[in-house]
From Swiss-Prot:
Coiled coil: none
Entry annotated with the keyword Repeat: yes
GO cellular component, one term: nucleus
Family (UniProt): Belongs to the WD repeat SWD2 family.
Cysteine disulfide partners in this protein: none
Protein name: COMPASS component SWD2
Lineage of the organism: Eukaryota, Fungi, Dikarya, Ascomycota, Saccharomycotina
Compartment(s): Nucleus; Chromosome, Telomere
Major location (coarse): nucleus
Keywords tagged on the record: Chromosome, mRNA processing, Nucleus, Repeat, Telomere, WD repeat
WD repeat windows: 25-64, 111-150, 152-191, 199-238, 246-287, 298-328
Functional summary from the UniProt entry: The COMPASS (Set1C) complex specifically mono-, di- and trimethylates histone H3 to form H3K4me1/2/3, which subsequently plays a role in telomere length maintenance and transcription elongation regulation. Involved in mediating RNA polymerase II termination. Component of the cleavage and polyadenylation factor (CPF) complex, which plays a key role in polyadenylation-dependent pre-mRNA 3'-end formation and cooperates with cleavage factors including the CFIA complex and NAB4/CFIB. Component of the APT complex, which may be involved in polyadenylation-independent transcript 3'-end formation.
Organism for this UniProt entry: Saccharomyces cerevisiae (strain ATCC 204508 / S288c)
Gene Ontology biological-process entries: mRNA 3'-end processing; sno(s)RNA 3'-end processing; subtelomeric heterochromatin formation; telomere maintenance; termination of RNA polymerase II transcription, poly(A)-coupled
Further information: Present with 704 molecules/cell in log phase SD medium.
Length: 329
C-alpha cells in the first residue's frame, strides 16, 4: 500500500479495487466505518447486528463479529488495534468495550437510557465521547465504567475531537449550533458557539476536524456540506453539487470526509460517484462545486458513508456493500 501526495490529479487516479458483499442472508446496510490509528485495519458495523473486520492494507475481509443480543452501531477502534468500543442498539444501550482477538468484553459503560448515535475516541488518550437520544453527551475513560462528565443536550448531537485532543465540538441540528468545548473546562460550557444561518441545512450526519486543525466540516445527507474556520467559527465554504440521499431508519457515519492533509473533501453522491472539492485553493465565503468525480462502482451502488485512511492512499465507501478505493498510476 502506497502513500502519495494529495492533489486533484492524484485523487482522480483513485480506482475501485474491491467490493465486499454482506456475509449473512439477513444483511442490512453498513452504519459506520472506522480505521485504526495506523491505517492497517477497517472496522464496520451493520444494521443486522454484526461488525466486520478488514485488512485495509491488503483490502481483505478478516472476520465477522456478531452482537445479536445487543445490536451494534458506531464501532470504533481504541488506540489498540485489537480493541474496539461500540454502542448497543437494543436492551440497555450500554457501550461495549471488546477485544477483537478473543471476542471477550473488557468493560461495559453504563448510563445512557436511549440509543447512542455517535462515539468518538480522543486522538491522544484513552477517553472518549458519546452522544445519545437520552438528551445527554457523556465523557468516559476506558478504565472506568461510569461517565466522567455528563453534558445535557436536548437532541442527539454530532461530535468530534480536534487533533490536539484538547477541544471537542458538539453539533446541534435542531438549533443550528455547534459548540466548541475545552476539555479542561467542560462545566463552563462552550467557549465558542458557531451559528449556521441556513434553515434548509438538515439531516446532519458528520462533524470532523481536519488533521491540520484549521477546518471543521459539517456533513449532511442532503447533498450539501459546510466548512468552518475551526478557530474563529466563520463559515468558509458551502460544498454543493451532489444529489441528496433519501431518508431511512438506519444511522450512518457521514457522507463526507477530509483527506488526511485537510486540503480536500471527498463526498458520496446518490448517483454513486465520489465528489472532490478543493477548498484550500479557494476564496473563503464561497459556494464550491466539485472539481471532479471518481467514477462509481456500478449504477446500482449508492454508498452513503465514506472514510479516508489516515496513513495510506486509500479510502472506503459503504452502504449495502463495502468498497475499497486505492491510488492507481
Amino acid at each position: 500500500m502506497t502513500t502519495v501526495s494529495i492533489n486533484k490529479p492524484n485523487l482522480l487516479k483513485f480506482k475501485h479495487v474491491k467490493s465486499f458483499q454482506p456475509q449473512e442472508k439477513d444483511c442490512g446496510p453498513v452504519t459506520s466505518l472506522n480505521f485504526d490509528d495506523n491505517g492497517q485495519f477497517l472496522l464496520t458495523s451493520s444494521s443486522n447486528d454484526t461488525m466486520q473486520l478488514y485488512s485495509a492494507t491488503n483490502c481483505k475481509f478478516l472476520d465477522t463479529i456478531a452482537s445479536k443480543k445487543y445490536g451494534c452501531h458506531s464501532a470504533i477502534f481504541t488506540h489498540a488495534q485489537n480493541e474496539c468500543i461500540y454502542s448497543s442498539t437494543m436492551k440497555n444501550f450500554d457501550i461495549k468495550y471488546l477485544n477483537l482477538e478473543t471476542n471477550q468484553y473488557l468493560r461495559y459503560f453504563s448510563g445512557h437510557g436511549a440509543l447512542v448515535n455517535d462515539l468518538k475516541m480522543n486522538p491522544v488518550n484513552d477517553t472518549f465521547l458519546s452522544s445519545s437520544y437520552d438528551e445527554s453527551v457523556r465523557l468516559w475513560d476506558l478504565k472506568i465504567s461510569k461517565p466522567q462528565v455528563i453534558i445535557p443536550s436536548l437532541v442527539p448531537n454530532c461530535i468530534a475531537y480536534d487533533p490536539s485532543g484538547l477541544v471537542f465540538a458538539l453539533g446541534n441540528p435542531e438549533n443550528f449550533e455547534i459548540g466548541l468545548y475545552n476539555l479542561k473546562k467542560i462545566q463552563e460550557g462552550p467557549f465558542l458557539i458557531i451559528k449556521i444561518n441556513d434553515a434548509t441545512f438538515s439531516q446532519w450526519n458528520k462533524l470532523e476536524f481536519s488533521n491540520n486543525g484549521k477546518y471543521l466540516l459539517v456533513g449532511s445527507s442532503i447533498g450539501k456540506h459546510l466548512i468552518f474556520d475551526a478557530f474563529t467559527g466563520q463559515q468558509l465554504f458551502e460544498l454543493i453539487g451532489t444529489r441528496a440521499f433519501p431518508m431511512r431508519e438506519f444511522l450512518d457515519s457521514g457522507s463526507a470526509c477530509f483527506t488526511p492533509d485537510g486540503e480536500f473533501v471527498l463526498g458520496t453522491d446518490y448517483d454513486g460517484r465520489i465528489a472532490i472539492w478543493n477548498h484550500s485553493d479557494s476564496i473563503s465565503n464561497k459556494v464550491l462545486r466539485p472539481q471532479g468525480f471518481i467514477p462509481c462502482v456500478s449504477h446500482e451502488t449508492c454508498p452513503r458513508s465514506i472514510a479516508f485512511n489516515p496513513k495510506y492512499s486509500m479510502f472506503v465507501t459503504a452502504d449495502e456493500t463495502v468498497d475499497f478505493y486505492v491510488y492507481d498510476e
